Amino acid sequence: MQSNKDHSWSGKDNEFPTFPIGIMRVLAAAEKNGYDGEIYDINNLRHTDEEILNNLNKVKPDLVGLSGPLSHCYPNLKRIIKIIRENYPKAWIVVGGHISGSSHILLHKTETDIVVVGDGEIAFNKLLDYIKLNPDRCEKKFDELKKIEGLAYFDENNKIKMTGFGQQIKGTDMEYPSYDKWQKGLNDFGSGGELIHEVFEEADDFRNIFGLNLEKQHYTPELLKIHSELKGKKVGRIQTSKGCVAKCTFCQRATKGYRVFGQNHMEARIIELKEKYNVGVLLVDDENFGSNRNQGYECARLMKKHGIYWSSQGARAKSISVDDLKFYKDNNMLAIRYGIESGSQTILDIMEKKTTTHDVYEQLETCKRIGVATTSEAFMLGYPGESRKTALETAKYNAQLRYLLGNNWNTAYPAWATSIPGTPL
């Protein structure tokens, strides 16, 4: 793995800094309800146990909310929870994020008090209201707790009680959290609030403007010209929707359905990123961009209106038409990434992808023809039902896609299928 020490805020060898979007949304919702809190970005700062304790002592928390996006966060969550409980025995410890698919493990193996399951904005606010009236974590009022949708905890019989999934905010009411609170936390707990600017990658680096691995196909005169225009600019990220229209059996989803952000909120965020953080390119971090065609078109119009180039980091081949791609290209789209997963229709059907190898080939062929950058590197091997025959079908298909795009046909970077807790797989 490439060392990223130059990008490490702590001076240690860690990945590029990332946006703690989920927990910022939850805190923003709590603040609208009259509560206050701090963002301590342990993930990016990568602090030692001693540093974590020193920073906790600055706040002396009554409640600590921890976000675990996926199951790989468990070892660090366990470590941090131990520090909190040993030093703040009266503090409530609440865990949320996709790792809530392993609520039983968190509750049995750590000192977690409550797990928020599913969307957290409403459930966490209701939990705060409960704790305000019942501050003692050791004397829970179970008749009241069970009224809150989206919680998992030990009940009066020491059995795990789950109250369903958290109530969702309507799509048009979803807002983008301010980075100001995050910046304050970086200043208070790290080595300076200006660290926030490191999250925005440099557009001077050609690969950053796509969010894809660089390939021969990307070095076109048009894209090189656009890259020269973006020198000195930053690359940011934005979501235009939450959720997906499909139910692939390998995918961990803690939110039901598919919701899109209101256009007024989206435009305000684009303007903020451009004017405050010098962003010239946005990577659209949707699981499933474009399934709501009207919203996808409006997003593209807003990007062009404000002079922003953009790339879609996740889309379904079945959801995007040729006309859609042409429209997006005309409105500043640079690249799009499709979930391909397999070159075997047998495996795609087992995954319940609801798409075909022909759908993907047609999309990549259109991208090549009209000049939208894309990638063929989104394959998964080792799925239940995988055989020598299906693996060879995937290898052949990948070679066909790479040849189609003008890349080296004999290289590939597949991932292993992973059975993440909370998924059918």
PLM feature segments, named:
Residues 1-269, 274-278:
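Acidic, low-complexity intrinsically disordered segments
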Residues 164-166, 174-175, 296, 324-325, ...:
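Short aromatic-enriched loop/helix-cap "lid" or pocket-rim segments at secondary-structure transitions
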